[in-house]
From Swiss-Prot:
One of its GO terms (cellular component) is cytoplasm. Keywords: Amino-acid biosynthesis, Arginine biosynthesis, Cytoplasm, NADP, Oxidoreductase. This is N-acetyl-gamma-glutamyl-phosphate reductase. Its EC number is 1.2.1.38. It comes from Psychrobacter sp. (strain PRwf-1). It is an enzyme of class 1 (oxidoreductase). SUPFAM superfamilies: Glyceraldehyde-3-phosphate dehydrogenase-like, C-terminal domain (SSF55347), NAD(P)-binding Rossmann-fold domains (SSF51735). It catalyses: N-acetyl-L-glutamate 5-semialdehyde + phosphate + NADP(+) = N-acetyl-L-glutamyl 5-phosphate + NADPH + H(+).
Length: 355
């Protein structure tokens, strides 16, 4: 039985980790930390966990490091900049680290410091970290000591692009035009649980807004996925615009591709189906169908629809996921399963919630 800790268990990704790991047959949650809720039962903060979890929040204070080194794996569901303060000591003690923030996502120190406004505390460890997207980086995750759990938007974008980029890598000529447009929408839970005027009910209900239009911190992560992890042999110029929509959870990314003459000769539907036929959490819908966010709610599933229009030389890739599960906590548990040699879907076979 793995002994685990969740650092930062009061945010939405933290409570999703508690929900998922409480029913995982191979783990025991040894520590659940929160300075603001220390001493309180988790079920008093989240009544949904009554009868499910008997855990109490702890503020380990000066004993944090010694307590966490008693664990096999530590999940950080904390703001950016927290995990990297503890990661080196934990790894030295043989503890695996899975960070749900951005400390270990970007391999470029320059990109990290530019977009996240932090000086990285352990650049040498960053070089050893694995990007936690199992569908493209499974082998690296298996042997990694540190996982940078992907951002929610990059998960949809990279997995939405993977089959066509890989097909293009095998072709002599480009299959898609250099310009890629990603139009993405997220429920408000993606902005976190903290109180903000822009996130209150009166501001978000019956409202729909774009943000990060001039530049969003997930853009370099998407670019890294395409050009480094997928090793695109053609340069792709990515335009990414996220939006906040009036729903609690869910994410819908629409990816617009221009097709070349060579690209129009291919059956993208067949390419996507073949690419993901063995992936337990990726569902490529039949031709002509459309995904919706409700179909993946509270699950670790990601659904893709491919729409190819050769007469207009274009393709539209539609991708949906739950931003808190496949876009965050579920993916972290999936990575843990890969790291420790468990069945990848263990503890994650939850049926999506409808309605």
């Amino acid at each position: 039985m793995l002994q685990i800790a969740i650092v930062g268990g009061t945010g939405y990704t933290g409570v999703e980790l508690i929900r998922l790991l409480s029913s995982h047959p191979k783990v025991n949650i040894k520590w659940l930390t929160s300075r603001s809720e220390a001493g309180k039962p988790v079920a008093s903060t989240f009544p949904s966990l009554r009868g499910i979890s008997e855990l109490t929040y702890s503020d380990l204070g000066e004993d944090t490091l010694s307590a966490l080194t008693q664990c096999d794996v530590v999940f950080f569901a904390t703001p950016h900049g927290v995990a990297m303060q503890q990661a080196e000591a934990l790894v030295a003690a043989g503890v695996k680290v899975i960070d749900l923030a951005a400390d270990f996502r970007l391999q470029s120190l320059q990109d990290f410091e530019h977009w996240y406004k932090h000086k990285h505390a352990c650049p040498d460890l960053l070089k050893q970290a694995a990007y936690g997207l199992p569908e493209i980086n499974r082998e690296a995750i298996k042997s990694a000591s540190v996982i940078g759990n992907p951002g929610c938007y990059p998960t949809t974008a990279i997995l939405g692009l993977k089959p066509v980029i890989e097909a293009q890598n095998l072709a002599s000529d480009a299959l898609i035009e250099p310009r890629i447009i990603i139009d993405a929408k997220s429920g408000v839970s993606g902005a976190g649980r903290q109180a903000k005027l822009s996130l209150n009910y009166a501001e978000t209900t019956d409202n729909f807004s774009a943000y990060g239009v001039a530049g969003h911190r997930h853009l370099p992560e998407i670019e890294q996925g395409v050009h480094v992890l997928l090793q695109s042999k053609f340069t792709q110029n990515i335009r990414f615009v996220p939006h906040l929509v009036p729903m609690i959870r869910g994410m819908f990314s629409t990816i617009h591709l221009g097709l070349t003459e060579a690209g129009c000769q291919l059956d993208l539907q067949a390419i996507y189906e073949q690419a993901y036929k063995d992936e337990p959490f990726i569902d490529v819908l039949p031709a002509g169908e459309f995904p919706d966010t409700r179909s993946v709610r509270a699950s670790n599933r990601l659904r893709i629809a491919v729409h190819q229009n050769n007469s207009n030389k274009e393709a539209t890739i539609l991708v949906v996921q739950d931003n808190l599960v496949k876009g965050a906590a579920g993916q972290a548990v999936q990575c843990m399963n890969v790291m420790f040699g468990f069945e990848e879907s263990l503890g994650l076979n939850h049926v999506p919630v409808v309605p």
